[in-house]
Every structure is written in C-alpha cells, then in structure tokens.
C-alpha cells in the first residue's frame, strides 16, 4: 500500500518536540500529506522546520482529510511515551474515517480495549512501532562473529534528542552515494518507521536490551561492510542511561560518533545534570565501552539547528580544534569529514589483520581525544 500519512503533532510541531514527524518529513516526504497542529495552522513544514517544502500544517483532522491520507501517524515521542489523553477522540475519529493508525508511543494502542474494538469495527489496522518481538535472547557477545568482515559504528550523545538517529541516516545516504555497502540498524520507533525494520530497544525488558542490539547488528551485517547503529540516550542521562549502556554492550561497536549540541549545557528536563566539556565526555564515553571492546570516538556530529550559519561554522571549527577530531553538522553541512573518518577506520582495521584500531591505540596510550 502506498502510505499517505496525516501526521498528528497537535501543539508539539517544533524542531525538537516532534521527532517522529520530523524524521518522516525529512526522509520520506513523499508519504506525508499534512501535519495537524492548530497552533501552527496555515504554515508549512518548511516554515516550521526549515525543511519539508510545501507540506501544509492544518488545524484539524477534517482539514487534513483534504489531502486524501490513508493513515494517521502519531508524530511525537514525549518523555515516557504516553498517549496525550486529549488525542484519544481524534484518533478514534480517524479510525472512523478509515485511516490506519501508526504509533511509536510506549502506550501500545492495539492493547487498548477501545482502540482495538474500533479497529475491528472499522476494518483499520493499528501499527505499534514500539512493540518488540517476544523472542529476544540475552546478549552473548555474538557481534564478534562479524569482526572479520564488518565494522560497527555506534552514535552516542551528550543527551537525548540530539541527533544520533539523524546523523546515522545522513551518513547512510551519503555513504551509499559513494558506493559503500552500508546498513542502518534502527533501535527506536522513528528509525523503524523510516527504515521499515528494527527493534525499539527502550521497549525491551532490561535484561534483553543488549540482546536486541546484538540481534540488530547481526541482521544488518549480513549484507554490509559497515553497520551504522542508531544510538539512544546518554551515559549521563538520569532516566535513560540504562538503554544507552545496553546498546553499547550489545552492539559491541568498533568505533563511535559523538553527537552534541554546542548550545546545550545541561540535560533537557534535568537542568541539575550539567553536560561535561566535550573532551572529558569523550574520555568517559570511551571508558564506558572499553571493558567489552575498546571503541574510540572517531568523529563529532554537531546539531547546530539553533545557530546561524556563522555560529554553526564557528562551533564546528572550535570543536575540531578542541578535540582534534573531524567535526561537522551532517545535516547542515557536508557529512564528508565523518564519512572519511569512518572509511579510514574501517580500512585500518583490516590493514591490521582484523585487529581494531582501538586496540592499537590502547596499547599506545589510548584514543586521540583522551590524550588531548
């Protein structure tokens, strides 16, 4: 079926608050007919986000139906992932209008008696993107089985919602344009929506998070030389660090890309948690990975959406100078500095007979950022 999404983001359609909507608009705009947000009605996605062209923002379901959608997409990923109670009636009305429902919330809509009953009555389907498979095993370090043929790159970050998924998707597209055999391993509901497969690891029972990550990498590595794993959370996040560590331990990355926002000095919604200087954070991040596999941070991806061009270029130059690592904003600018670092790292692994560059560095005193 050719999906035609009407995206529900009422009161939340912004560069940071509507993550699922924004990714769908950026990477699959051909499937989006309109966005519902009465506070932005009359504008376009381009006006609100800086991309998305003429996709309209409308004030109601009735107005959105003019675009002939066949599905309603829940366009937000709020803290806790719960369905806003005020949205229930609109979703039920959308089902009455024969729209399938796509949701990435922790609230599993197909388990809700009212939604399930209405779906049966109207003949529509509910797609819960965060519903994990029920046969995930614990991690057993099996990613080591692909060490002789694939390089695993994990995005990590100083906070949530800072660009870990977007960075990997930008890298995926640009690397494929270069002819690389690269795969993106989605670990969250929005990545699953864009890519069409994956596991939302934050919905997995804690004991099996690493196992889910392991499973994703093994699947992605079947037809790829480089696996780009979507990171989640942050090692210093007071709410979500458990998912972050599960991904590190399960995906066993060979190297990491650090994602940061130059203007963000504290964890969002937790202002008491200050973000350390980037060089210090890199040392902490590498130390977190080291017990299972030394994995250096080899490049920095900045999110400069809230800076003008001069400020963004200045931030890139400053971080490059301070860390000694290739740095760019892979959305705003050319992602080539990060891609070049990944390709050089991948080549070096196999030039060393399969030994990781991280191991070589560790023997010589640690990663470049740690020496700085």
Task: Locate predicted features.
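Walker A (P-loop) phosphate-binding motif
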Residues: 139-182
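Flexible, glycine/proline-enriched loop segments at strand-loop-helix junctions
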Residues: 102-106, 154-162, 199-204
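C-terminal lobe/tail of nucleotide-utilizing enzymes
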Residues: 5-8, 12-13, 45-62, 272-372
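Extreme N-terminal, non-catalytic leader segments
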Residues: 90-152
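ATP-dependent carboxylate-amine ligase catalytic core
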Residues: 2-4, 10-12, 16-18, 26-27, ...
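Conserved catalytic-core segment of NTP-binding enzymes
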Residues: 107-109, 113-115, 128-129, 133-136, ...
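Phosphate-bearing ligand-interacting subdomains
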Residues: 56-97, 101-111
């Amino acid at each position: 079926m050719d999906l035609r999404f009407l995206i529900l983001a009422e009161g939340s359609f912004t560069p940071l608050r509507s993550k699922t909507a924004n990714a769908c608009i950026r990477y699959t705009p051909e499937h989006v007919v309109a966005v519902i947000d009465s506070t932005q009605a009359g504008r376009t996605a381009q006006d609100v986000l800086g991309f998305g062209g003429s996709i309209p923002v409308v004030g109601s379901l009735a107005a959105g139906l003019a675009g002939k959608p066949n599905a309603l997409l829940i366009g937000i990923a709020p803290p806790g992932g719960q369905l806003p109670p005020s949205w229930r009636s609109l979703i039920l009305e959308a089902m009455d209008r024969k729209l399938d429902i796509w949701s990435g919330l922790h609230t599993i809509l197909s388990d809700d008696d009212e939604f399930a009953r209405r779906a049966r009555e109207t003949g529509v389907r509910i797609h819960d993107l965060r519903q994990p498979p029920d046969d995930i095993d614990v991690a057993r370090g099996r990613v080591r089985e692909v060490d002789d043929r694939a390089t695993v790159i994990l995005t990590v970050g100083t906070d949530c919602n800072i660009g870990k998924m977007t960075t990997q998707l930008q890298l995926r597209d640009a690397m494929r344009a270069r002819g690389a055999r690269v795969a993106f391993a989605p670990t969250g509901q929005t990545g699953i929506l864009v890519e069409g497969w994956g596991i939302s690891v934050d919905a997995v029972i804690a004991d099996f998070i690493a196992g889910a990550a392991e499973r994703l990498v093994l699947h992605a590595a079947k037809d790829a030389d480089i696996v780009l794993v979507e990171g989640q959370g942050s090692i210093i996040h007071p709410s979500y660090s458990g998912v972050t560590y599960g991904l590190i331990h399960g995906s066993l990355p060979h190297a990491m890309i650090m994602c940061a926002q130059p203007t963000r000095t504290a964890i969002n919604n937790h202002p008491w948690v200050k973000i350390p200087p980037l060089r210090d954070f890199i040392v902490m991040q590498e130390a977190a990975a080291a017990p299972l596999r030394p994995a250096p941070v080899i490049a920095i991806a900045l999110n400069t959406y809230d800076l003008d061009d001069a400020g963004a270029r200045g931030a890139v130059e400053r971080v490059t100078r301070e860390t000694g690592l290739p740095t760019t904003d892979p959305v705003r600018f050319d992602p080539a500095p990060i891609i070049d670092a990944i390709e050089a790292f991948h080549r070096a692994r196999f030039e060393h007979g399969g030994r990781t560059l991280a191991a070589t560095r560790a023997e010589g005193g640690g990663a470049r950022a740690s020496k700085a």
